[in-house]
Each structure stands twice: as structure tokens, then as C-alpha cells.
Swiss-Prot record:
This is Small ribosomal subunit protein eS24. InterPro entries: Nucleotide-bd_a/b_plait_sf, Ribosomal_eS24, Ribosomal_eS24_CS, Ribosomal_uL23/eL15/eS24_sf. GO terms for biological process: translation. PANTHER family: 40S RIBOSOMAL PROTEIN S24. It holds the Pfam family Ribosomal_S24e. The gene is rps24e. One of its GO terms (cellular component) is ribonucleoprotein complex. Keywords: Ribonucleoprotein, Ribosomal protein. Belongs to the eukaryotic ribosomal protein eS24 family. GO terms for molecular function: structural constituent of ribosome.
Amino acid sequence: MEVDILSEDENSMLHRTDIQFEIAHEDATPSRLSVRDSLAAKINKDSDEVVVHKLDTKFGMRKTIGYAKVYDSPQSARQVEQDYMLKRNKIEIESEDEDSAAEGA
């Protein structure tokens, strides 16, 4: 699987970079997690800092166009992203019990 970055837009207010990318693949559309790991390796980031939002493969084509958000830290991703998107990308969500325990310590 080969990842090519098409565009990068810096969003300093939300501590992230929005990336559009293209993937060339031989078999079926790769999973969201394998795309996330490949993209993270390409841009030298931790996979918890990358949230893949969209993967679009045209019928019969062996390339996929995607959209991802790359955050400065995993904490920034947890603060900004919605829970369902974090679950799709297998990023751990901090529960309220953990937050209140951390505040009380």
C-alpha cells in the first residue's frame, strides 16, 4: 500500500493539520486502521494522533482518496474529536471517572 499526500492545511487553532491523501492498493480497500498506521508512519507521527475521517474508493479502481486530521498530541485529538470518530479509529476515550480521579489527586 502506497500513501501519497495530496494536500496539507494547517489549523493552528485546533492544533492539527488536515490532510488529503491517495492510496494505491492491489487488493480490496484497506482497513481504516491500516491506513491510519501507514499515514502515521509516512508523516512520522504516533498513530493515536491521526484520525482518518473519510475513505472513498471508486468502483473498479485500485486507488482510494482519503481525508485525515493529524493532531499535535493524542490529548488534542481526544478534546476536539467526537467519541464515535475516536472509537472508529481505536483511540482510547478518557472516561469521566478517570478525569474526576485525576482532579481529586
